[in-house]
Amino acid sequence: GAYASFRSTLSAQPDRVATGLTREKWLLLLLRELDYGRVPTTQGGHMTAGADGDVRQYPVSHKWADVPIHLMGWGVDLDRRTEGVAGAARAPQAMVQEFLNRSDDHLWALLSNGRVLRMLRDSSALVGQAYLEFDLEAMFDGELFSDFVALYTMCHQSRLERLPGEE
């Protein structure tokens, strides 16, 4: 399948970060299977959040409807900054969480490096971070079908789609 093909190509890749490969050969395919269709990149390579003269830009890579989706490379740690890697000048987790907390227009986001997939929620009313994490590497290396069912159930586009009239 797509994951096995991606891992085979990844093992021959000299680039330890492998952002393009991870996105094109793995994560965008996974998102299609979760019914997001073709997920476009963000306009200008960023999204903005904030108000009253304190609007900031966040280097979120993709967006589906009103859901920010930040896709990093296999070699990028989501909890630490990776110098020289676009979208990881700050820890990707912290950056996406701050974006959600500062935005009035976004409640959910997806974040992944191909190894794990996180579904984040605006947590401005909570202390700390608010996310579910799915270990994609363990799930697909170990063929853990029941874990994939949980991922599919929680992260399917229908879970994050804002219906008309919802705020």
Regions found by a protein language model. Give the residues of each.
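N-terminal accessory segment at the very beginning of proteins
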Residues: K25, Q43-H46
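Short, basic/polar, glycine-containing "phosphate-handling" surface segments that engage DNA
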Residues: G1-P14, D66-V67, L71-E167
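Conserved catalytic cores of phosphodiester-cleaving nucleases, focusing on short active-site segments
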Residues: W26-L27, L31, Y36, G50-E83, ...
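Solvent-exposed, non-transmembrane amphipathic alpha-helical segments
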Residues: H46-A51, E137
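His/Asp/Glu-rich acidic catalytic environments and adjacent acidic regulatory segments
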Residues: Q43, G53-V55, D147-F148
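Proteins with a high burden of low-complexity, intrinsically disordered sequence enriched in S/T/G/P/A and R
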Residues: D15-T19, Q57, E167
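Charged, often low-complexity linker/regulatory segments
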Residues: G1-E33
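Short Lys/Arg-enriched alpha/beta "domain-start" segment
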Residues: V39-P40
